[in-house]
Amino acid sequence: MNLVITLPQIKHLAQTGSSSEYFFFFMERKPNIIMDGFFTKISVSTSYFTMNGLFLTFGIREKHTDDVYINDAVSSVQNGYDNKYYIYFDPYTIENRYTTECVIQLEEIILKMYGNTIPSKTPVYSLKTQLQGGTFKIHRERSNEMQGKYILKISGVWESAHSYGVTYKCTVYS
């Protein structure tokens, strides 16, 4: 079972600085074999249970046309391998602006919390950079799976000698 957090809940968390429903905490730092650094899992807890990772749902309406999916705000193109697709969108439309602001605020909250433990390192806002640029990568099984709804999983924080940032993956919500 996974607990999914909605955009309004993220907005509330960003505005108040706290949540009566969710508590975030970081697990033990472990060496990262992919990069020279460390990985720390993020856990989310409620009064009922605790789980690894943070799951956020968000939606973007899409229109399908051949191999490229286009509407006024969104288009996606398959990269041709590993079931990875790039979603291109206008981050400044009303619908998309709300989504990007919420996700950016969530990333900022997590990195601020983590940064309190390592003040000498610089945060890297990779989600913010991608979303403000109007793109993100998703994982899906079939090209006809585009439904305009996605799940962002933030599994933890990576840390190198000088910087740190969130580790995340986007998938199609089914």
Question: Where does each model-flagged region fall?
Answer:
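OB-fold ssDNA-binding interfaces and closely related basic DNA-contact patches used
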Residues: 1-117, 173
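Broad gene-expression machinery/nucleic-acid interaction feature
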Residues: 55, 147-149, 165-167
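Fold-level signal for large, globular catalytic cores of enzyme and receptor domains
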Residues: 81-142, 147-154, 162
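OB-fold single-stranded nucleic acid-binding module
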Residues: 155-174
